[in-house]
Structure formats: C-alpha cells, structure tokens
Amino acid sequence: MAVVPIRIVGDPVLHTPTQPVPVGDDGSLPADLGKLIADMYDTMDAAHGVGLAANQIGVGLRVFVYDCADDRGLTERRRGVVVNPVLETSEIPETMPDPDTDDEGCLSVPGESFPTGRASWARVTGLDADGNPVSIEGHGLFARMLQHETGHLDGFLYLDRLIGRYARSAKRAVKSHNWGVPGLSWMPGEGPDPFGH
C-alpha cells in the first residue's frame, strides 16, 4: 500500500497506551484494518525492521506486524500480524544486560541501540488479520521482539526499560539528536538509512 513516516521518541502517540481494535459481535474486524496492516508491512520492510507497532506510524490501535528470525544470525524468518495482543513471558533477569547479547534497537529511536534486559521466552495471543485466534511464541530475538512490540502498544519504548549507564547513555543520545519533543518522524527509504542497511 504505502510507506509512511515513523514517529520518533517524544511523540505523544508513542507514550500513550493504544486502544483495542474493535471486534464485531460476529468476530469481524474493521474494514479499514487491512489497509493499516498493509501500510505497516510496507513501512517495516522499507525500514528493514523486525517489527512495527501501529502507534509508531501514528495510529493508536493495538496491532503490530513482524518479520523476525528466531535468533540473531538465522536467515529463516517468521512474518505476521497480531491484533489486540496479550503478552506472557518467563522471568526477566534482574542483572545488568550484556552489551554483547542484549543489544536492542527501535525504529522510533533511529540509529541507536542499547543493552536491554528482556525475558528469554515470550508468547503473544491475539487475533490475525482475519479475526482468527493466533498464538505465537519464541525464545531469543523473537521473544525480544514480542516484548518490544507489545511494550509499544502499552505506551512504552525500550528506552523506558534501560537501567544504569545504559539509561544515561540513552538520555544523552536523545538530547544530542534533539529528540524527545512532539512531531518528529523519519521516512524509511528517503535519505541515509539510520541503521546502515
């Protein structure tokens, strides 16, 4: 359908919990949801992302798309959409994240990445694009993506989970880019790729 701008940290839509997608009495989803999902896929693909939440493109609905390997370095990927996701995870470690294995980035924090503590396993249940029940789960990178995208839908960025020196580094990065204010976005496919793809 269309590649659309991705909102940058500081935009209120990223820091506000999303609303559930309305489901009809017959289990049907809104007719215009298909266009939103297509735009989300196009935008995620153009940005070379592994996931994208609706509020990252300015739509406050509880839906995300993904195209993610089960773990780093693997070429086989899983691709899909989850509407009205509910997240379940294993325990999140209370130790400092490892900068070599726990690095995480975000399309709404373009070009930056920071070690982030996440559960090693996660499952999301919800609906697919046709309103059918869906349950997806995984370990490693896939689990990280599930937690990251549902976090967006709850009104949080991964920066909100950072601790210690990583949180301080992220605050400096946001300030140095003049982010943290409403109205900023970037357009995948235009200009240099902030992630170097």
Curated annotation (Swiss-Prot):
Required co-factor(s) are: Fe(2+)
| Keywords, in A-Z order | Hydrolase, Iron, Metal-binding, Protein biosynthesis
Question: Which BP terms in the Gene Ontology apply to this protein?
Answer: co-translational protein modification; translation
Name the InterPro entries for this protein.
Answer: Peptide_deformylase, Peptide_deformylase_sf
Query: Gene behind this chain?
Result: def
PANTHER family per the record?
PEPTIDE DEFORMYLASE, PEPTIDE DEFORMYLASE, MITOCHONDRIAL
What's its top-level EC category?
A: hydrolase
What does the cofactor field's note say?
Answer: Binds 1 Fe(2+) ion.
Protein name from the UniProt record: Peptide deformylase
- Check the UniProt entry and state the signal peptide residues, or none: none
**Where along the chain is the active site annotated?**
149
Reaction(s) catalysed (UniProt annotation): N-terminal N-formyl-L-methionyl-[peptide] + H2O = N-terminal L-methionyl-[peptide] + formate
Q: Which GO terms describe its molecular function?
A: metal ion binding; peptide deformylase activity
Q: Which family does it belong to?
A: Belongs to the polypeptide deformylase family.
| UniProt xrefs under HAMAP family | Pep_deformylase (MF_00163)
Report the EC number(s), separated by commas if there are several: 3.5.1.88
Question: What is the documented function of this protein?
Answer: Removes the formyl group from the N-terminal Met of newly synthesized proteins. Requires at least a dipeptide for an efficient rate of reaction. N-terminal L-methionine is a prerequisite for activity but the enzyme has broad specificity at other positions.
Q: Which Pfam families match?
A: Pep_deformylase
Please report the organism this UniProt entry assigns to the protein. Mycolicibacterium paratuberculosis (strain ATCC BAA-968 / K-10)
Matches recorded under SUPFAM superfamilies: Peptide deformylase
Residues recorded as binding Fe cation, renumbered to this chain, are 106, 148, 152
Q: Does the keyword Translocase apply?
A: no
